[in-house]
From Swiss-Prot:
Role noted for this protein: Involved in the degradation of plant cell walls. Hydrolyzes the feruloyl-arabinose ester bond in arabinoxylans, and the feruloyl-galactose ester bond in pectin. Active against methyl ferulate, methyl sinapate, methyl caffeate, and alpha-naphthyl esters with chains containing 2 to 8 carbons (C2-C8). Inactive against alpha-naphthyl esters with longer chains (C10 or more).
Sequence similarity: Belongs to the AB hydrolase superfamily. FaeA family.
Protein name, as recorded: Feruloyl esterase A
Residues the record marks as carrying a glycan: N100
Entry-linked Pfam families: Lipase_3
Assigned keywords, A-Z: Carbohydrate metabolism, Disulfide bond, Glycoprotein, Hydrolase, Polysaccharide degradation, Secreted, Serine esterase, Signal, Xylan degradation
Annotated consequence of substituting D98N: Increased optimum pH. Km value for the C4 alpha-naphthyl ester is decreased. Has higher activity on short chain alpha-naphthyl esters than wild-type, but no activity on substrates containing 6 or more carbon atoms
GO annotation, cellular component aspect: extracellular region
Active-site residue numbers: S154 (nucleophile), D215 (charge relay system), H268 (charge relay system)
GO biological process, one term: xylan catabolic process
Amino acid sequence: MKQFSAKHALAVVVTAGHALAASTQGISEDLYTRLVEMATISQAAYADLCNIPSTIIKGEKIYNSQTDINGWILRDDSSKEIITVFRGTGSDTNLQLDTNYTLTPFDTLPQCNGCEVHGGYYIGWVSVQDQVESLVKQQVSQYPDYALTVTGHSLGASLAALTAAQLSATYDNIRLYTFGEPRSGNQAFASYMNDAFQASSPDTTQYFRVTHANDGIPNLPPVEQGYAHGGVEYWSVDPYSAQNTFVCTGDEVQCCEAQGGQGVNNAHTTYFGMTSGACTW
C-alpha cells in the first residue's frame, strides 16, 4: 500500500494551489493529545471499551438488536464531560446500513431546514434515539456543569454526527470528534453542522473531523450523489504527530479525500497507531 509521509502530504497540499491558503501543517500538543484520547475511546468501542483512559467512567450501554447499533455513555470527572461514543461497523447488519446511500429527510430535527442524511445511518440513529436522549438527560441532570462530547469511528462517526446535531437542539457546549467519518448528509446538513458547531474556522470549531492518510471511507458516499462533509478536517499523516497533522478548511477534496483511497483500507482501520478493537495500545 502506498504510504503518505508528512513530506509527501505537504507536496500534495502545495500542488493543490487554491487549497494552499486553507491548509496548514501542525497543531498544538494539547489539541493533538485530545484527538488521540478521543480516537482511543472510539477504537476501543469495537472491543467493549478495552484500554480506555483511566479517568473515564464507563456508564450505560446503548444498544438496538435490530440495527446492531452499539454505544456507551461515559463520564470523565477530571475534564467534567459526559461522553457518548458509538462503535463502528461490526456486523453484516451494520454493513447493510453502511451501503444504504439513499438520502433521507432528517425528520427528527425539523429545525435543520432542507437537511437530508445518509439513509442507513438515519435508520441506525432512530433505533437508539430514545435511549441516547434519555441517558444524556439523566447524566446532565446529575452533572449540570459538565460539557457534552460525542465521538465515534466510521459508522460510529456518522452516528456521532447525527447525535450531536440532535443534541444541539437541546444543549449548548457540545463537542464532536469523528474519525474516518463517511459523508453523513447533504450540503444543507453540512452547513447546519458548520453553523451549530462554529466550524467556519479552526479557532472556533467544536466539530473536529479527523482523517488519516488515504483513508477511503471519507470519500463515500460520493459527492455526485448529493453528499458533502462538514466540520474542520484534521488530516493525520505518518509518522503521526502534532506536527504531522494538517488543518484543512474550505475545499473538502484537498487533503485526505484527494489521496484516492477507496473504501476500507489500512489507513481507515488505524488512527494514531491504534487499530479498531485491537487493544494493543
